[in-house]
Amino acid sequence: MVLSAADKSNVKAAWGKVGGHAADYGAEALERMFLSFPTTKTYFPHFDLSHGSAQVKGHGAKVANALTKAVGHLDDLPGALSELSDLHAHKLRVDPVNFKLLSHSLLVTLASHLPNDFTPAVHASLDKFLASVSTVLTSKYR
């Protein structure tokens, strides 16, 4: 999915407003995903998945860091996320549908924390961005 100049601007502006909360929002999105889509828990059998667990917070920070890197490389998502794509495809073997579920959970999290900034245009741009990230992360499954 190709991001327009307006999409890129919206994504950068929205992610900029996330600021120092990125790791917290990442953890919250994971918690939402685990609650809304319980089958996603199967990839984390060794995690304490309770609210506020250190393991969920730690993985939320990893998710947030990867997205921050992606936002910084909107013109080269495949290059920026190549190692992460390899990890998820070859080592972790995460079912690609889970990226869509996490993307949805992240959009809900961002909308709940940034209600005044989460306009329809920003929503659409973030959705396209997360779909692009998901596409890159699943590209090495083939």
UniProtKB/Swiss-Prot annotation:
This is Hemoglobin subunit alpha-4. Keywords: Heme, Iron, Metal-binding, Oxygen transport, Transport. O2 binds at residue 59. GO terms for biological process: hydrogen peroxide catabolic process. SUPFAM superfamilies: Globin-like. Residues 2-142 form the Globin domain. Heme b binds at residue 88. The keyword 4Fe-4S does not apply. Involved in oxygen transport from the lung to the various peripheral tissues. It comes from the Eukaryota. The keyword Nucleotidyltransferase does not apply. It holds the Pfam family Globin. InterPro entries: Globin (IPR000971), Globin-like_sf (IPR009050), Globin/Proto (IPR012292), Hemoglobin_a-typ (IPR002338), Hemoglobin_oxygen_transport (IPR050056), Hemoglobin_pi (IPR002339). GO terms for molecular function: haptoglobin binding; heme binding; iron ion binding; organic acid binding; oxygen binding; oxygen carrier activity; peroxidase activity. Heterotetramer of two alpha chains and two beta chains. Red blood cells. One of its GO terms (cellular component) is blood microparticle. Belongs to the globin family.
